[in-house]
Amino acid sequence: MSKAFKLTSKFKPSGDQPQAIEKLVAGLEDGLAYQTLLGVTGSGKTFTIANAIEKVQRPTLILEPNKTLAAQFYAEMREFFPENAVEYFVSYYDYYQPEAYVPSSDTYIEKDASINDHIEQMRLSATKAITERHDTIIIATVSAIYGLGDPDSYLKMLLHLTRGDQIDQRKILQRLAELQYTRNDLELRRATYRVNGDIIDIYPADSEREAVRVELFDDEVENLSYFDPLTGEMLRRVPRITVYPKTHYVTPREKLLSTLDQIKIELKERLSQLEKANKLVERQRLEQRTKFDMEMILELGYCSGIENYSRYLSGRNEGEPPPTLIDYLPKDALLIIDESHVTIPQLGGMYRGDRARKETLVEYGFRLPSALDNRPLRFDEFEKLAPQTIFISATPGPYEEKQSDQVVELLVRPTGLIDPEIEVRPVATQVDDLLSEIKKRAAQNERVLVTTLTKRMAEDLTEYFTEHNVRVRYLHSDIDTVERVEIIRDLRLGVFDMLVGINLLREGLDIPEVSLVAILDADKEGFLRSERSLIQTMGRAARNVHGKAILYADRITDSMKRAMEEAERRRIAQSAYNEKHHITPKSIQKAVTEIIEGARTYTERGRFVNQAQLIAEEEAKYIAMTPKQLAKELRKLEEQMYHHARNLEFEEAAAVRDKIQHIRKGLLEVKE
């Protein structure tokens, strides 16, 4: 039996949170299809949603606009629900080049991808959890609306073993091969198995740290246990186990054979069409490619690009929506769309771009027309499939405003902080005025965010402030997610005082140390200076008691006027609440941690420890060393760094390099 959702937190709902939780829960119980949680920055939206989930006790899918925010939400939910299944479902590609054809230059681009093994495991773990447990929360990106294997076929392929079962060893090995597991007697890795006499060791595709041991005696399952694949230590015996497939795209043999029959029929029709149109090159190309795929499917059960035949594999008719993560959800599931003003347009835009690329592939004989049904959901299909929904945003978009049966406001922060004071200053002196403001904030150990309209302006501004001895960094779209997280962490740690950006200083950027947000050229009406953009950007200063937003403008646009009026409305409500309850505002205190994997790291024994705790322990270890021991340790770390570099493991090499620099810079000073 599944556990109940159990929220673990040292905080109790306060401010506007109790009434918001009550209204959301009442709305869900009354059967409202759509609700909006309009929550200002720092009001505890995540905590409010966590409380609502605990009260309604329903499995939940949370959609985020990007991987960074998904990782942040995942970390927080794992802290709130340590006893429940909190899962992470994002795109597993580190690099993805879709299959495409450019007719103008007659260039065919083959699909090329690099799959992140760890994220693939987390995706499989997510679908396993939602099929086995009611107490599941999945944090996902728009990857959730892309085609996934058919849930019915996937669940039919499960391998169930119970202690005492009569089963031939060869039958188990055959079933593992059907699940696309490979035999590897030398090294036990994810989605592999090894055989040693009557013992079969299986490393499940969805497992991160545990493998399964099946002990047979005379065609009878004598023992089933979980063990540590690294140390071989037995962890626990169990009466039964279920082994899940290596991929979501596995299909029972009989369905594969019927799929091949359907592909043959479609191929024959399409070849005839191409011949009549005198497209002989396309005809020959399509026949050769499709027959090769069919041969692979017949022999191995899969082929490269098998998802292009997903219409037949999942038994759908032409034009029907593909099976997605939403199809794996139980009927009583709850959907939460975070930063909905960004996520909703994303959900609507995925289908069209995918369709245009595939139509070209079909037209020029690279794919059968049925490949068009390997696609993300259209927005109207998503709406039909979506369970009861809660939108979360500080600035809901027109869709949420139109659809919502109820808007629940979360204006008051538990810390008593009020929205930043807003000031409008002239554009003519904006750079010099900003320079004096930055120096004031830096002297108080506070940080500044500056947003510009163009890349050129951001670069020039960064250069100018650097010349005037301001510690400044520039955040732009070419910086990848990991580096972006590092820059934000360095800003919080005080490595520099000012961060310049264009459109990157908005949703979900959680930096309590920021006391000033400066918006240059605020009167240039447009996407970057719309009412929503201004409210989101100004909100970045709302986590600090000295929070202030300066808008540099020569006139007040309609967007500025509406944004300032909304901010003033919120300030009045917040001040009135503070006065009534005698609350003195105080800045949010938040430790600087790594966000992916919930600020957790594995020790060699496979147990979770806090990242900050590990760093503190390491520092204490180095401080206790003699100079000779320290020199030896540094040499060892340098060897480790070069070893990683030689193996092209550049991220690991960079991490060791940073560690060496940290020891030399900080700990040697302590020695002196």
UniProtKB/Swiss-Prot annotation:
GO terms for cellular component: cytoplasm; excinuclease repair complex. InterPro entries: Helicase/UvrB_N, Helicase_ATP-bd, Helicase_C-like, P-loop_NTPase, UVR_dom, UVR_dom_sf, UvrB, UvrB_inter. It is found in: Cytoplasm. A motif (Beta-hairpin) lies at residues 92-115. It comes from Coxiella burnetii (strain CbuK_Q154) (Coxiella burnetii (strain Q154)). Keywords: ATP-binding, Cytoplasm, DNA damage, DNA excision, DNA repair, Excision nuclease, Helicase, Hydrolase, Nucleotide-binding, SOS response. Residues 430-592 form the Helicase C-terminal domain. ATP binds at G39, V40, T41, G42, S43, G44, K45, T46. Its main location: cytoplasm. One of its GO terms (molecular function) is ATP hydrolysis activity. SUPFAM superfamilies: C-terminal UvrC-binding domain of UvrB, P-loop containing nucleoside triphosphate hydrolases. Belongs to the UvrB family. It comes from the Bacteria. NCBIfam families: PRK05298.1 (NF003673), uvrb (TIGR00631). The UvrABC repair system catalyzes the recognition and processing of DNA lesions. A damage recognition complex composed of 2 UvrA and 2 UvrB subunits scans DNA for abnormalities. Upon binding of the UvrA(2)B(2) complex to a putative damaged site, the DNA wraps around one UvrB monomer. DNA wrap is dependent on ATP binding by UvrB and probably causes local melting of the DNA helix, facilitating insertion of UvrB beta-hairpin between the DNA strands. Then UvrB probes one DNA strand for the presence of a lesion. Residues 26-181 form the Helicase ATP-binding domain. Forms a heterotetramer with UvrA during the search for lesions. Interacts with UvrC in an incision complex. This is UvrABC system protein B. Gene3D superfamilies: 6.10.140.240, P-loop containing nucleotide triphosphate hydrolases, UVR domain. GO terms for biological process: nucleotide-excision repair; SOS response. Residues 631-666 form the UVR domain.
